[in-house]
Amino acid sequence: MDKNLFVALTIAIGSAMPAFAIGLLASKGLEAIGRNPEAASSIQTAMILAIAFCEAIAIYALVVALIIKFV
């Protein structure tokens, strides 16, 4: 098959799933802060750390797509 198709599928799936996870994390994090405002700082810290890990997966997908494209 065409390399460009594999690149497109890699970056599409590799960025769509982390985007879904980030949306779910933010939704549940804000819901938890709404229920317990005193714990907002610890919830926010954990939420930002989890979002960073999800973004790392999207960056790995970009790197894999670039490797497929140029190698």
Cite the ranges covered by each PLM segment.
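Hydrophobic alpha-helical transmembrane segments of small proteolipidic membrane proteins, enriched
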Residues: 1-71
